[in-house]
Swiss-Prot record:
Self-association state and partner proteins as the record states: Heteromultimer composed of HisG and HisZ subunits.
Keywords: Amino-acid biosynthesis, Cytoplasm, Histidine biosynthesis
Disulfide bonds: none
This protein's encoding gene: hisZ
GO cellular component: cytoplasm
Family classification: Belongs to the class-II aminoacyl-tRNA synthetase family. HisZ subfamily.
Protein name: ATP phosphoribosyltransferase regulatory subunit
GO molecular function terms noted in the UniProt entry: catalytic activity, acting on a protein; histidine-tRNA ligase activity; transferase activity
Compartment annotation: Cytoplasm
Length: 379
């Protein structure tokens, strides 16, 4: 038997057509918002990613000159490099992409190691309307596929960041706390508080964070706690929410103030998309105002990435995986009518049909039921 490595998959014709259809819908929506598509290389020097990703999470290899290369684990970092080193012009700059990403993930928890992301980056503006735009765009993109019952959970990196700065924790403890909050593991968080002897105000906030998810009332709930570090954050989230309300997006929005992102380059608003019946995020995004500075240009930015495969799975589970397929037409012809048959086939193709041509003799083994129409030329 010949097997594939863990975390990769083949896409057979119908499955791949379904996938491409979703990707094309995303491209159409991105383009309608003024975003231009870009395609970075599949691999780069490993050091281009080393400040963002652990070596063990990347697929790294040597070239013949001894350079250490890596398959891209993230497209946002690549776009930050491109904008910082190759793109000059007026801002804001709107870029989008559909590209495969490679990460050495734990496949036991349902993650792939090669997967496709469709995303956008809005660079050069730090206004709340920019954050609202990319969140609204993520919603419009997901809606374009026919997906139902999804929500965008919104949080802010500074809720967690302000706590960590006050606690003066080491990197290992910060990562542990991040993981506990991600899991909303209240008992383990309580043990962490006691073990680290965290002072009363921060301890109270840590206990609250796993519970701070829901509608706009969550913002009011945290405001009443009077944590100084979160005052500006809550005001900002409230302004973004009001913009999204004006956009007619209220039904798709909820808040999760205990949200933390695995990628450490987020500096402001963060968000994730979830769909009913699927335990994984189908979309992740947020503001990353310090990332471009690493590559030499100090510009604010915000964006998101949608997992195409997870959207496929969600659509299949919702039985929304069908799309309007083009009509399939069979053109049968006599050999002496080949020229006329080809001209007829091209007319049908220009009308949006998928057309196959066979002589009458070759049609003996063709499944005529697989075609929506059969056109005979010369019979």
């Amino acid at each position: 038997m010949i097997y594939l490595p863990d975390g990769v998959q083949d896409f057979l014709p119908e499955e791949y057509e379904f996938k491409r259809n979703i990707e094309d819908k995303f491209r159409e929506v991105f383009k309608s918002f003024g975003y231009k598509e870009i395609m970075p290389p599949t691999f780069e020097y490993s050091e281009n990613f080393s400040h963002l990703f652990d070596e063990n999470s990347m697929y790294r290899f040597f070239d013949k000159k001894g350079n250490i290369l890596a398959l891209r684990p993230d497209v946002t970092a690549q776009i930050a490099r491109i904008v910082s080193t190759k793109l000059e012009g007026r801002y804001p700059l709107k870029l989008c992409y559909v590209a495969n990403v490679y990460r050495y993930e734990d496949t036991q928890v349902g993650k792939m190691r090669e997967f496709t992301q469709a995303g956008v980056e809005l660079i050069g503006t730090n206004h709340e309307e920019s954050d609202a735009e990319v969140i609204a765009l993520s919603i419009e993109a997901l809606k374009s596929t026919g997906l139902k019952d999804f929500k965008i959970d919104i949080g802010h990196a500074e809720v967690f960041g302000s706590i960590v700065r006050n606690l003066n924790l080491g990197n290992e403890d910060v990562n542990l706390l991040r993981e506990l909050l991600e899991q909303k593991n209240q008992s383990a968080i309580e043990d962490f508080i006691k073990q680290k002897e965290i002072k009363r105000e921060e301890a109270k906030l840590l206990r609250e964070l796993p519970l701070l998810f829901g509608g706009e009332e969550i913002l009011e709930k945290l405001k009443k706690e009077n944590f100084k570090e979160t005052e500006g954050v809550l005001e900002y989230l409230d302004r973004v929410y009001k913009i999204l309300e004006d956009f007619g997006m209220k039904e798709y929005i909820s808040f999760d103030l205990g949200m933390v992102q695995n990628l450490n380059y987020y500096t402001g608003i963060i968000f994730r998309g979830f769909v009913k019946g699927l335990g994984y995020a189908i979309c992740t995004g947020g503001r990353y105002d310090k990332l471009l500075k690493i590559y030499g240009k100090d510009l604010p930015a915000t964006g998101f990435a949608i997992s195409v495969e997870r959207v496929m799975l969600a659509l299949q589970r919702q039985s929304k995986g069908e799309w309007v397929k083009p009509r399939r037409v069979l053109v049968r012809y006599k050999e002496e009518e080949r020229r006329r048959a080809y001209e007829k086939a091209n007319v049908l193709r220009k009308e949006g049909n998928v057309v196959e041509m066979y002589t009458f003799k070759r049609c003996e083994n063709i499944d005529l039921k697989s075609f929506d129409e059969v056109v005979d030329v010369g019979e």
